[in-house]
């Protein structure tokens, strides 16, 4: 019997019921499997799992929340996704103590600019914003993210 290629497995998974936990978990597994051969596809699959798992958290089943966090961790570690990192590191904080999630709609644009530094699309990013907008705190998170990926 012929063995299915990774792409065939992914196509079958994408055609399957993606509200099923096992299918989503398998899709995240395939994102990891194809990481070395197709990083862009890997990121798309992981983001798909991330958003579907987040939507399915409304069912009240904790396993979807855990899968959402697994997808965030995968994106933060393997794809150096700063937005995912910010969401992941604060997942266990009390909602009223979180920095990023409540401000995400306002500062997502800045997070994306910082992502361009990580992706080596920018050499320098100059940030000029009024006091109290979160520049320093976001900068501290950014430094911790960079130090985690480049410890030396």
Where are each of the predicted segments found?
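Intrinsically disordered, low-structural-confidence terminal and linker regions
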Residues: 1-43
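Phosphate/NTP-binding elements of NTP-utilizing enzymes
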Residues: 30-40, 47-57, 61-152
């Amino acid at each position: 019997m012929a063995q299915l290629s990774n792409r065939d497995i992914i196509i079958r998974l994408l055609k399957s019921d993606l509200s099923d936990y096992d299918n989503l978990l398998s899709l995240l597994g395939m994102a990891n499997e194809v990481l070395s051969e197709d990083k862009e596809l890997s990121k798309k699959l992981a983001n798909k799992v991330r958003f579907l798992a987040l939507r399915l958290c409304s069912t009240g089943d904790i396993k979807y929340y855990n899968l959402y966090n697994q997808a965030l961790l995968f994106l933060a570690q393997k794809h150096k996704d700063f937005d995912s990192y910010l969401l992941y590191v604060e997942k266990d904080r009390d909602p009223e103590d979180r920095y990023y999630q409540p401000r995400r709609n306002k500062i997502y644009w800045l997070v994306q600019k910082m992502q361009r530094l990580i992706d080596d699309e920018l050499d320098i990013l100059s940030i000029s914003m009024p006091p109290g907008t979160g520049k320093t705190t976001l900068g501290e998170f950014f430094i911790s993210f960079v130090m985690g990926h480049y410890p030396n």
